[in-house]
């Protein structure tokens, strides 16, 4: 696969120079200008330039809406087909009949799948922020199921309210009936859907790099530009980060499917580079996406599930609480809120009638709730900053084009 598109390598290197009035600009000055432009864009954030950031965000939103409107206008047949299908689904949903029991069941499953796939996409794409939805949503969900399973001696939680709320079933389970596999099976759907979402979120770097390689155009994406610079200076790379990126690139390029599978299965921050590498070397789509899907939705998710389940198993949690209490001086005061939190969770699991009543709030749960709110707020702010910087990049590209034509 490394041979695909190799005739374009020298042409790609030649495109790093700009021709102006019959002469070529020094590549070092071009790189310096790109660096200054990048630093200028990075300063466009809400806490430094709030008015400009909000203005650019609004303008970028209008530009994106205009682009999507234009794309949809040129695909009128697809839009009409979509609305006809939507109208048929709405009619099926609201018309009374014997089919409603199946509609409700499909709706429940669809919303469950869409929720976790959406969180997986957000975790993978992140829009420049890396919103770690595993730490905020899936991890706590697996931990809650694990704690409840050991407390109830069962994973047959009543539905509803599960998965929105976990309470013990009326029939008591036998002591020691819970196994690692039973908890893994209970959270398999949520975890696999989340993993599928993360695999889908890895597609944009692949498509961007593939389109840039096939078209031969100068790419706008900074990560792709850094990737090309890394290939040009591969022999002189000295720092650890560059060597790690080169190792990932060589693994994917030479091993192919199993190299991509290895990168997707092992938690690492460099998988975006694998997507760019596969797109750049024109790896077939199903080779890339198939390996990514298997690695992220099956292998990696089982590794993460087992880690969370083992960490929050009953005896491990009890040992951690006891260890906290053994800290000299401050141990008992630190141990108390953890004990209160665990006791409150047990009460919620065993008292069905009190599940909806207000209970005293523990500072641990209060802290976690505020952490989630802060992460979501930061994610929203980062979207605003990212879109504002995208509009600033449009302005810089327009100015650079005008300079070249003078």
Curated annotation (Swiss-Prot):
Highly expressed in intestine, kidney, ovary and placenta, moderately expressed in liver, lung, stomach, thymus, brain, and testis and slightly expressed in control thyroid and retina. Strongly expressed in pancreas (acinar cells) during acute pancreatitis. Residues 2-77, 131-250, 295-305, 385-406 are cytoplasmic. Residues 99-109, 272-273, 327-363 are extracellular. Residues 378-406 are annotated as: Required for interaction with BECN1. Induction: Overexpressed only in pancreas during acute pancreatitis. Up-regulated by starvation. Up-regulated following MTOR-inhibition by rapamycin. Phospholipid scramblase involved in lipid homeostasis and membrane dynamics processes. Has phospholipid scramblase activity toward cholesterol and phosphatidylserine, as well as phosphatidylethanolamine and phosphatidylcholine. Required for autophagosome formation: participates in early stages of autophagosome biogenesis at the endoplasmic reticulum (ER) membrane by reequilibrating the leaflets of the ER as lipids are extracted by ATG2 (ATG2A or ATG2B) to mediate autophagosome assembly. Regulates ATP2A2 activity to control ER-isolation membrane contacts for autophagosome formation. This is Vacuole membrane protein 1. It comes from Rattus norvegicus.
């Amino acid at each position: 696969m490394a041979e695909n598109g190799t005739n374009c390598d020298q042409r790609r290197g030649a495109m790093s120079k700009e021709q102006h009035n019959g002469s070529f600009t020094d590549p070092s000055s071009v790189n310096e200008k790109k660096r200054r432009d990048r630093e200028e864009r990075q300063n466009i954030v809400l806490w430094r330039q709030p008015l400009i950031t909000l203005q650019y965000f609004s303008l970028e939103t209008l530009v994106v809406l205009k682009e999507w409107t234009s794309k949809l206008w040129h695909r009128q047949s697809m839009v009409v087909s979509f609305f006809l299908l939507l109208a048929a689904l709405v009619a099926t949903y609201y018309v009374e009949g014997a089919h409603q029991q199946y509609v409700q069941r499909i709706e429940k499953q669809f919303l469950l799948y869409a929720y976790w796939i959406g969180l997986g996409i957000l975790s993978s794409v992140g829009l420049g922020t890396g919103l770690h939805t595993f730490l905020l949503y899936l991890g706590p969900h697996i931990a809650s199921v694990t704690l409840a399973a050991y407390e109830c001696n069962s994973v047959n939680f009543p539905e509803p309210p599960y998965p929105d709320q976990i309470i013990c079933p009326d029939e008591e389970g036998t002591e020691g009936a819970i196994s690692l596999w039973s908890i893994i099976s209970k959270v398999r759907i949520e975890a696999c859907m989340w993993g599928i979402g993360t695999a889908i979120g890895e597609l944009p770097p692949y498509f961007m790099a593939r389109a840039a390689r096939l078209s031969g155009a100068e790419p706008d994406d900074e990560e792709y530009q850094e990737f090309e610079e890394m290939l040009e200076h591969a022999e002189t790379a000295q720092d650890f980060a560059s060597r790690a990126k080169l190792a990932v690139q060589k693994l994917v390029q030479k091993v192919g499917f199993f190299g991509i599978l290895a990168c997707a299965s092992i938690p690492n921050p460099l998988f975006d580079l694998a997507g760019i590498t596969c797109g750049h070397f024109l790896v077939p789509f199903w080779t890339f996406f198939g390996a990514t899907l298997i690695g992220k939705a099956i292998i990696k998710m089982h590794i993460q599930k087992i880690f969370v389940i083992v960490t929050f198993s009953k005896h491990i949690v009890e040992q951690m609480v006891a260890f906290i209490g053994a800290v000299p001086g401050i141990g008992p005061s630190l141990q108390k809120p953890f004990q209160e939190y665990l006791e409150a969770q047990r009460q919620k699991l065993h008292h069905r009638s009190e599940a909806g009543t207000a209970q005293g709030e523990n500072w641990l749960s209060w802290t976690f709730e505020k952490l989630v709110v802060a992460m979501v707020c930061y994610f929203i702010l980062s979207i605003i900053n990212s879109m504002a910087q995208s509009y600033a990049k449009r302005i810089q590209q327009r100015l650079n084009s005008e300079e070249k034509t003078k």
